[in-house]
């Protein structure tokens, strides 16, 4: 989903280092451990980033002036090659809620460590994940397990979209809890992918 972009004038130290060329890759940004507070940092290094709206919900609450309606958008961004972000945004306009969610997803970007952790396969292709990982959100717990090439993504539609944008092609997925809650199912899958960075193996990226 494309939106018109204004000229970027970085205001954070990290943003200024990126704009000046001192930081030369998104990996350097992520490895610095510093929070990404400007989405343009991600745009600079990942111009091919895709976004997908997973859910839009109408939310109502009572205020002193009466009933107020807002929309909540849940969005993921990814380049189908090892990077994924998750975000949600709220606004009285659907389009603005989506824009806010995309911005937050970019600022929550993580690198996914891919590999072939399946004993049934053992190839050196980065088609799956290097080991079993788990992620939780609310009542939902998602377990991702490496799968051999050709199995595909054995999971529900929401989790599948997250894995696809992250660049995972084969994986077994097991989920518990209220998986019909889109936001928690998506976030639990995202959190599981974040865990791939906790362990490094010789056949992963």
From Swiss-Prot:
GO cellular component, one term: small ribosomal subunit
Gene Ontology molecular-function annotations: rRNA binding; structural constituent of ribosome
Superkingdom in the source lineage: Archaea
Gene3D superfamilies: 3.30.160.20, 3.30.230.10
Alphabetized UniProt keyword annotations: Ribonucleoprotein, Ribosomal protein, RNA-binding, rRNA-binding
Record's keyword annotation contains RNA-binding: yes
InterPro entries, per the entry: Ribosomal_Su5_D2-typ_SF (IPR020568), Ribosomal_uS5 (IPR000851), Ribosomal_uS5_arc (IPR047866), Ribosomal_uS5_C (IPR005324), Ribosomal_uS5_euk/arc (IPR005711), Ribosomal_uS5_N (IPR013810), Ribosomal_uS5_N_CS (IPR018192), Ribsml_uS5_D2-typ_fold_subgr (IPR014721)
Domain S5 DRBM: 49-112
GO biological process entries: translation
Subunit structure: Part of the 30S ribosomal subunit. Contacts protein S4.
Domain notes: The N-terminal domain interacts with the head of the 30S subunit; the C-terminal domain interacts with the body and contacts protein S4. The interaction surface between S4 and S5 is involved in control of translational fidelity.
Family, per entry: Belongs to the universal ribosomal protein uS5 family.
Role according to the record: With S4 and S12 plays an important role in translational accuracy.
Name of protein: Small ribosomal subunit protein uS5
Organism annotation: Methanoregula boonei (strain DSM 21154 / JCM 14090 / 6A8)
């Amino acid at each position: 989903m494309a939106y018109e972009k204004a000229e970027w004038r970085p205001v954070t130290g990290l943003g200024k280092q990126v704009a000046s060329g001192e930081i030369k890759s998104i990996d350097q940004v992520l490895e610095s451990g510093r929070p990404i507070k400007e989405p343009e940092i991600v745009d600079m290094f990942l111009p091919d980033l895709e976004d997908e709206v997973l859910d839009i919900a109408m939310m109502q609450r009572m205020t002193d002036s009466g009933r107020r309606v807002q929309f909540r958008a849940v969005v993921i961004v990814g380049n189908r090659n090892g990077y994924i972000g998750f975000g949600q945004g709220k606004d009285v306009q659907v389009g603005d809620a989506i824009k806010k969610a995309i911005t937050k997803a970019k600022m929550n970007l993580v690198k996914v460590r891919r590999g072939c952790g399946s004993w049934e396969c053992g190839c050196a292709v980065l088609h799956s994940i290097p080991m079993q990982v788990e992620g939780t959100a609310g009542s939902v717990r998602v377990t991702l397990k490496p799968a051999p090439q050709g199995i595909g993504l054995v999971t529900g539609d929401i989790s599948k979209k997250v894995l696809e944008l992250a660049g995972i092609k084969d994986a077994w997925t097991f989920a518990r809890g209220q998986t019909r809650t889109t936001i928690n199912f998506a976030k639990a899958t995202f959190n599981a992918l974040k865990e791939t960075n906790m362990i490094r193996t010789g056949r992963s990226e």
